[in-house]
C-alpha cells in the first residue's frame, strides 16, 4: 500500500459502503481523478447500512426521489451485470386491510412515478408463487422489475 496522500481533489469519507463506492464510481466515470477514500472500518465495511440491506430492489416508494434513485440503481446494476429483474411479490393476508391499503398506496405512487408495479389477485399471486395458499391471500403487489 502506498503512503497516505497529504492532499487530494476529493476525499470520500465512508468509502466502504454502497454510497461512498457509488460516489467514487460516478466521479471516476465523469473524469475525476486524485480521489482518496477513507472509512473507519475496513473496505468493504460490514458496519454500515450496506451490510444490513436486503439485497432486493423494489421500485415502489411514496416519494419521487426514492423511486427515481431506486430505478436508477436497478438500471445501473443491470448495466454492470449484477441485476436480474426476476419480479417481486408482496402479499396482504385475508383480514389485513391495513396491509392491503398500504400496498395499494405504494402501487398508486409507483404508477405516478413511472414504475410497472400493479395490484394482482390472490389467484395471480399463486400463479407466480405456487406455494402460496390462495385462500389466505387478499391480494398482492407485483413489481416485474424487482430483483
Predicted ranges, named:
Residues 3-19, 36:
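Beta1/beta-strand and adjacent pyrophosphate-binding region of the FAD-binding site
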Residues 6-7, 14, 31, 52, ...:
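Residue-level preference for short coil/turn positions at secondary-structure junctions
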Residues 53-131, 138:
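Dinucleotide-binding Rossmann-like beta1-alpha1 core, especially the glycine-rich loop
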Amino acid at each position: 500500500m502506498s503512503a497516505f496522500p497529504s492532499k487530494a481533489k476529493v476525499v470520500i469519507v465512508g468509502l466502504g459502503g454502497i454510497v461512498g463506492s457509488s460516489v467514487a464510481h460516478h466521479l471516476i466515470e465523469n473524469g475525476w481523478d486524485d480521489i482518496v477514500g477513507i472509512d473507519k472500518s475496513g473496505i468493504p465495511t460490514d458496519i454500515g447500512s450496506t451490510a444490513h440491506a436486503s439485497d432486493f430492489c423494489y421500485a415502489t416508494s411514496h416519494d419521487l426521489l426514492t423511486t427515481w434513485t431506486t430505478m436508477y440503481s436497478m438500471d445501473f446494476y443491470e448495466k454492470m451485470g449484477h441485476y436480474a429483474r426476476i419480479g417481486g411479490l408482496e402479499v396482504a393476508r385475508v383480514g389485513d386491510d391495513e396491509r392491503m391499503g398500504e400496498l395499494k398506496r405504494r402501487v398508486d405512487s409507483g404508477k405516478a412515478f413511472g414504475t410497472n408495479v400493479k395490484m394482482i389477485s390472490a389467484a395471480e399471486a399463486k400463479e407466480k408463487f405456487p406455494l402460496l395458499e390462495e385462500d389466505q391471500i387478499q391480494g398482492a403487489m407485483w413489481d416485474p422489475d424487482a430483483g
